[in-house]
């Protein structure tokens, strides 16, 4: 299979363990158990996995004095040059002495395996808190802005002896900032992209001595790639490392948390000035996210200089206005928490027609992710829209969405079921962002996505001849919820929008005929066939809305599985059916209106 064929299958970046093949999932579990055993033998207790990324895994444990430690393991499957980065990270972390940065303890190498040991930052990362709470208040954003600005000052003022040697973190984003509510302590973690700055904030070369300046290659960069959803333009385009990189990371972080997004790209459509922040801070954040370098730098200088004064503003927590969701969703009556994954199709039109370049030799894990996730030739608003769809999959939600852009309007059809009522406010923020970003897209076209529970995914392995192996054919799972017939005036169809140009999998005619028969029964759901050379994954979510048809529905689902095993082609194809047509229409809107934190909050509190 060439890489292009599978590229359209777009799932949230931390792939669910339920989507790994049986062999890979087993290897994954064995490897985690080996790490836990190794750390337990070294005398640590309560060892647990607390995170994983492109480069490795992170464990936590308690030492014999009761102190919490963190252990970062590099993935041994990576190239040696990439594994060596963990040692570089250990060195950079050892250079930073700041109360907001976890202390470096040691770096060990056991055979090929590097292990970085450091103090544990207690609490929860801000991305997780943002998913639970939605938009951060003005007071929280202001307090965070001041703390991050103070860390940046410390990094800029780092010296080697008496010579200036500024440090760049290179990957400031919400998930790399850990907050402990009990102690009100903030920690900046993950120094894997950290380097010594090559140029200062003014763009002048940094050299510890005259000889360094003479020998420095001023055309190459030592910069590492941070998270492509948060880094600024200079870092993204391979510019020389500079303290400006971290200004950009801070601006992206403040913007993402204030707006309840998981990236920086939405700022043209949902500017900081629309997020109920104090006017001065909102304008500074928008300036720092500007496409114009001079504007960015001048806003960054203002931020660094004036943040302590700005932070003195009186910003009491005001009662949050009741925000209604722009599109409806329901809470599930079932207790189970789905492990949500999103599949989206028909993204082709979101790309910019004049950019067809493709980097085939992608050796950086972050860049690889950038290309896989379809971002390399889409505009910023389109990137933000796709990232907002990914953010929806961070909630325990199942269902489907369809966005149709025509002339001056956006039409949205949806069916969403959230499995946790405590997340209602935050999910409303997430879904409203998706709609506002969609209102800012000018291209005309159609975009659809399904959200399903990865735990229900059926996996069938192929034998040497390509035929599927199974003892008993698995069954497609479904729920039943009886809806009054009078509620169904305009049924929605699987075949509503014709053939999807993005999908390449040729399905047998009998599979399509079976879907056609299912279409006659009132239900909602999706089925996605992801056929790989060695196996097939069948992702699905079904909810029958007419209980009287259950025997027929069950019979057709069983038939569908029998026909699915005759698929020989490789690729992806899917069908989605919403419960009924309930189209919401929105005007297009290139930029949301200004909304600032009130000048006189006392008056509002007294009302």
Predicted regions and their residues:
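Terminal C-lobe "cap" of eukaryotic-type protein kinase domains
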Residues: 293-295, 301-318
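Conserved short submotifs of the Hanks-type protein kinase catalytic core
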Residues: 111-125
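ATP-binding glycine-rich loop module of kinase domains
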Residues: 61-83
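Juxta-kinase regulatory segment immediately upstream of eukaryotic protein kinase catalytic domains
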Residues: 2-40
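Regulatory extensions appended to serine/threonine kinase catalytic cores
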Residues: 315-468
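Activation-segment/catalytic-loop signature of the eukaryotic protein kinase fold
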Residues: 107
């Amino acid at each position: 299979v060439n890489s292009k064929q599978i590229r359209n299958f777009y799932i949230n970046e931390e792939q669910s363990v339920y989507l790994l093949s049986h062999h890979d999932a087993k290897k994954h579990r064995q490897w985690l158990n080996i790490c836990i055993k190794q750390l337990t033998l070294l005398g640590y207790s309560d060892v647990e996995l607390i995170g994983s990324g492109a480069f490795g895994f992170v464990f936590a444990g308690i030492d014999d004095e009761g102190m919490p430690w963190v252990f970062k393991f590099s993935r041994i499957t990576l190239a040696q040059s990439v594994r060596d980065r963990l040692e570089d990270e250990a060195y950079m972390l050892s250079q930073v002495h700041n109360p907001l940065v976890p202390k470096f303890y040691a770096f060990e190498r056991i055979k090929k395996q590097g292990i970085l040991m450091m103090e544990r930052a207690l609490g929860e990362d801000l991305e997780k808190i943002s998913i639970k709470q939605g938009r951060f208040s003005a007071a929280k954003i202001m307090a965070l802005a001041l703390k991050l600005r103070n860390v940046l000052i410390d990094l800029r003022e780092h010296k080697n002896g008496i010579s200036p040697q500024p440090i760049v973190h290179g990957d400031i984003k919400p998930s790399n900032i850990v907050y402990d509510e009990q102690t009100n302590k903030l920690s900046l973690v993950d120094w894997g992209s950290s380097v010594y700055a090559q140029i200062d904030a003014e763009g002048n070369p940094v050299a510890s001595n005259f000889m360094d300046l003479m020998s420095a290659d001023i055309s190459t960069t030592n910069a590492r790639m941070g998270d492509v959803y948060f880094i600024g333009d200079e870092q993204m385009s391979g510019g020389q490392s500079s303290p400006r990189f971290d200004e950009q990371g801070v601006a992206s972080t403040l913007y993402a948390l204030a707006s309840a997004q998981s990236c920086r790209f939405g700022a043209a459509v949902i500017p900081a000035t629309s997020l109920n922040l104090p006017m001065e801070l909102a304008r500074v954040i928008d300036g720092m996210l500007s496409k114009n370098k001079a504007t960015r730098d001048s806003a960054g200088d203002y931020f660094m200089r004036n943040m302590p004064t700005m932070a003195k503003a009186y910003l009491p927590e005001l009662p949050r206005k009741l925000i209604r969701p722009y599109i409806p969703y329901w809470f599930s009556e079932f207790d189970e928490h789905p492990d949500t994954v999103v599949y989206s199709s028909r993204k082709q039109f979101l790309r910019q027609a004049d950019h067809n370049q493709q980097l085939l030799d992608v050796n950086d894990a972050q860049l690889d992710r950038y290309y896989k996730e379809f971002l390399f030739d889409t505009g910023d608003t389109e990137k933000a829209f796709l990232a907002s769809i990914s953010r929806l999959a961070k909630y325990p939600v199942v269902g489907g969405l369809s966005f149709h852009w025509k002339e001056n309007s956006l039409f949205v059809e949806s069916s969403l079921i959230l499995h946790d009522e405590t997340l209602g406010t935050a999910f409303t923020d997430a879904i409203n962002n998706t709609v506002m970003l969609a209102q800012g897209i000018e291209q005309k076209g159609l975009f659809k996505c399904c959200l399903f529970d990865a735990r229900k995914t059926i996996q069938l392995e192929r034998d040497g001849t390509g035929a599927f192996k199974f003892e008993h054919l698995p069954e497609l799972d479904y729920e039943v919820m009886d809806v009054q017939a009078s509620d169904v005036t305009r049924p929605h169809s699987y075949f509503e929008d014709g053939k999807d140009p993005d999908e390449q999998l040729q399905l047998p005619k009998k599979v399509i005929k079976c879907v056609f028969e299912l279409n006659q029964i009132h239900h909602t759901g999706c089925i996605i066939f992801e056929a790989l050379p060695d196996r097939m994954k069948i992702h699905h979510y079904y909810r029958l809305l007419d209980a009287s048809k259950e025997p027929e529905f069950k019979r057709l689902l069983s038939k569908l599985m029998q026909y699915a095993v005759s698929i020989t082609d490789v690729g992806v194809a899917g069908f989605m059916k919403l419960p009924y047509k309930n189209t919401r229409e929105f005007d297009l809107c290139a930029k949301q209106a200004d909304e600032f934190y009130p000048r006189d909050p006392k008056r509002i509190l007294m009302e």
